[in-house]
Design a protein with these regions (language model features):
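Active-site phosphate-binding and catalytic loops of NTP-dependent enzymes
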Residues: 53, 91-95, 109-116, 133-136, ...
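Flexible glycine-/small-residue-rich
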Residues: 25, 35, 48, 61, ...
Length: 436
């Protein structure tokens, strides 16, 4: 062998520094490593010297001679000098029909005590959204069995919607109604940043314990920021697997706000400058990367997505709420004041909108919905006059008509948590209100 060919072979061999490194510094939220030359987004495995703890982490920052890793778990138990290796499987998770009926964490490790999950297919957690020119037109209704939504804020198959509400207004109950009443053959639920006790409560109370067609991905509030962040992306990857099989998928995530808070923790720890309400720029850049992955793709299935947004102090100008509204195809606002009148779910139809509705409903449905909203708005505008008895019947024919329909409209807006209606039933009820 010539000297030149030997040199060429040696250059082509991976350098030792590319294979493993060591932990050189540990902080409360990240681990500094040296001797490894990773790229941002690489997954590494940290092998503890004391053999009590091994863990995975993601490379979030790279400098000339060192890199910084955010662990999927917590840093306790790791020591300076622990070995660090690049994880060969990268950011891939197992996916398959075996996930149906299971509750898993963001790394697809079972949390339900039902044993190991044996999937043969793998999918990347991070993936580009559907190409704009490959998106299918949204021209089919997507029923969720809720009168207010299907009748007045009709969704389309492949649409992305937000559910905006303050704490304790009924987001979880509404989520459960949507999952339970939806006709979608596959349902993927992401519970991100939830309290631990809320997970079994959601499954038993809102889903009735029936998970046959459902996959639940859980990252509770006590999980690391990286687990909470990637829990959302893992759930979307699972939904994409079923979409790629030609299936229509319901994706529902609670909540975008806690997902954003997880990225805020990561970003601030890396030295990003805080902007509005302490959120670094990476948070606002991350939202479309997640939300735009939902939709309808030509030649494949669809992902119809509902993202809940926790609005602090019912402030709809919150930066996460603002950014989410700009990305999504519609928004459903829950109003705390409506609960005082016994209206559940407390959907504020004046401040809610579905941008797809006109493309998926027929002319009669559209006209009946417009009449309903017009009557509702008139009653709200004249609420004070009506309450103090200052309005004289006959002064305004349109308002008189609205007053005559108030009881029927209130009944339409109310729905029990365990009730569900078909599209045909809802369209009939809406038509009857305008023609009674």
């Amino acid at each position: 062998m010539s000297l030149n060919s030997l040199k060429s072979k040696l250059k082509s061999k991976p350098q030792l520094s590319n294979i493993f490194g060591v932990v050189s510094k540990i902080s409360s939220t990240s681990i500094e490593i040296t001797g490894l030359r990773p790229s941002i987004g690489d997954i590494v495995k940290i092998i503890s010297k004391n053999s009590l703890k091994d863990g995975l982490g993601m490379v979030t920052e790279v400098k000339q001679d060192r890199a910084y890793v955010s662990p999927f778990g917590f840093v306790e138990g790791f020591r300076i000098g622990d070995m660090v290796y690049l994880n060969e499987s990268g950011m891939n998770i197992p996916v398959g029909m075996e996930l149906l009926g299971r509750v898993v964490d963001p790394l697809i490790q079972p949390k339900d005590g039902k044993g190991a999950i044996n999937c043969t297919d793998y999918a990347p957690i991070m993936r580009a959204p559907i190409d704009a020119m490959k998106r299918g037109l949204i021209d089919e209704k997507f029923g969720v069995g809720i009168k207010t939504i299907d009748g007045l804020l009709t969704c389309g198959k492949g649409q992305k919607l937000g559910i905006f509400a303050g704490s304790g207004v009924g987001k979880s109950t509404l989520m459960g109604m949507i999952v339970r009443n939806s006709t979608a053959p596959i349902k993927v639920v992401a519970l991100i940043g939830e309290r631990g006790r809320e997970v079994p409560e959601f499954i038993e109370k809102n889903l009735g314990g029936n998970l046959d067609s459902t996959v639940i991905i859980v990252a509770t509030s006590d999980d690391s920021p990286l687990m909470r962040k990637y829990g959302a992306f893992t759930a979307m990857s699972v939904a994409e697997y079923f979409k790629d099989q030609g299936m229509d998928v319901l994706f529902i995530m609670d909540s975008v706000t806690r997902f954003a808070m997880a990225q805020r923790e990561i970003g601030l720890a890396l030295g990003e400058p805080p902007t509005s309400k302490g959120y670094p720029p990476s948070v606002l850049a991350l939202l479309p990367q997640l939300m735009e992955r939902a939709g309808k793709e030509e030649g494949k299935g669809s992902i119809t997505a509902f993202f809940t947004v926790l609005v602090e102090g019912d402030d709809m100008s919150d930066p996460i709420a603002d950014q989410s509204r700009s990305i999504l195809d519609g928004h459903i606002v829950l109003n705390r004041a409506l609960t005082d009148f016994g209206i559940y779910p407390p959907i504020d139809i004046q401040n809610s909108a579905s941008r797809i509705m006109n493309d998926v409903v027929n002319k009669e449905h559209r006209e009946n919905a417009i009449k309903f909203k017009r009557c509702y708005s008139l009653l709200k505008e004249n609420e004070v006059l009506l309450r103090i008895g200052a309005y004289q019947k006959g002064s305004d024919k349109e308002l008189d008509f609205a007053i005559s329909k108030k009881a029927y409209m209130d009944d339409f807006l109310r729905q029990g948590a365990n009730e569900g209606f078909s599209f045909e039933e809802i369209e009939k009820k809406l038509s009857e209100i305008n023609n009674k």
